[in-house]
Amino acid sequence: MIVFLFRGIFRDKSRFLFPISIVTIGVALVVALVGFMEGVFMGMIDMTANLDTGHLRLVNKPFYDEEHLRPLDRSLAAQKETLKWLEHNTNSDIKWAPRIRWGALLDVPDINGNTKLQTPVVGMALDLKSSDSFEVKRLRLVESLLKGKLPLSKNEMVIGNQLAQSLKISLGQSVTVLGQSFDGGLVADNYTVVGFVKFGVTAMDKKMVLIDLIDAQNTFYMEDTVTDWLGYFPPSFNFTNYVDVKNKINFNLNTWIKTPPKDWAKDDIPITLSILDQQNIGSMVKTFTLIKSFVIGIFTFLMMLVLWNAGVLSGIHRYGEMGLRLAFGESHWKLIFTLGIEGLFIGILGSIVGCIIGGTFTWYLQDIGLNMGDAFSKSGLMINDVVRARLTLEGFIQGIIPGIFSSVTGTIIASLAIFKRSEANLFRELEAG
């Protein structure tokens, strides 16, 4: 019987084309909408993680408590030993990267070597020179480089493009970094500006300076010492699991603290934070999740309403067929059951085609992206100019369920009208058709 119904659907275009087209369009739109919204939001999280917080962050609690002061004397020593511990006590798919957050005065000399301009800068030291480092790719420095090159030699730096313009710095110019060392003393070291970058975040473009990790350790007397260990998950890892991983690492840290490395200070207390604990990202996640649920909920409800009406209209046009089948002796409930099976077939077929179309569009936006740099240029959000969608199982589920449910429900509700009409009236509609 099922094969018979299936063949009947394809042979009768009035029962096939319109309902399946409505289901296909609705499911495709939901899959594409969920993928786009998920991609924009996860793009913002990944951008923030890459530039600043990491998905996970191991930091000394005394440093974190006074982070706005960039207290290098509260950094965490035993860099090599810490890396070994992280690799043995955390998930194997987490990639850990050491960084140094520093703050200093940037002194720009005139032709005589005297101070011409000075400004406070926010600095980040990371591994820019190692061949096996992911940091250059992670921060998209090659794509963000407007002029010059990335640091290759000793004591070279790249700075934000707006910072370079405000200080009137040219490529190859020597500048002096004035700051505090790990021991609390004053340091002054000369660097050569070799590149200008555009991060796409106004605050960073105006104040950010990037130098190599080894150069920073030499300048600030921080051998085998860093301020942060940033952990990065693969793109497929959902942010809802960050907290569980963080808690597991903190549990292991409590054991490690009892037998700490010899280079740690007595009051060093390393802690692990997730991105949700920093930069107010946690509250933003809750707000975005609520807004996404509301928008998708409204859209899904409207889609279900349209599909429901499509099922009702399809059923109304088949009242004559229902009367004929009743006249041949088919029972009311068997008739409703077979029509419901047809609605299920239509819902499944439409959902499959809709998933293919919506998934293809989402995959295209995930691979190619959509340039929205002009829209985000003044927003201050840490988000890429090129917005990419994200193909997720959740998007397919949110499209398939209303697609199938609405098709079946609309068909069954329209079919219930046969209880209110006589066979003669239903048969008369067949004659009128």
Language-model-detected regions and their locations in the chain:
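N-terminal Sec/SRP start-transfer signal
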Residues: M1-A32, F41, N50, W333, ...
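Hydrophobic alpha-helical transmembrane segments of multi-pass inner-membrane transport and secretion
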Residues: K13-V40, K286-E321, L344-I357, I401-T409
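Alpha-helical transmembrane segments
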Residues: A28-L58, F63-Y64, T362-L365, G369
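Peri-transmembrane interface segments
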Residues: V40, N241-L305, S314-I316
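A short beta-strand structural signal in non-transmembrane regions
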Residues: L56, L163-A164, T225-N252
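A structural signal for hydrophobic secondary-structure junctions
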Residues: K61-Y64, P71-D224
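Short helix-loop junctions at transmembrane helix boundaries
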Residues: I352-I400, I412-L416
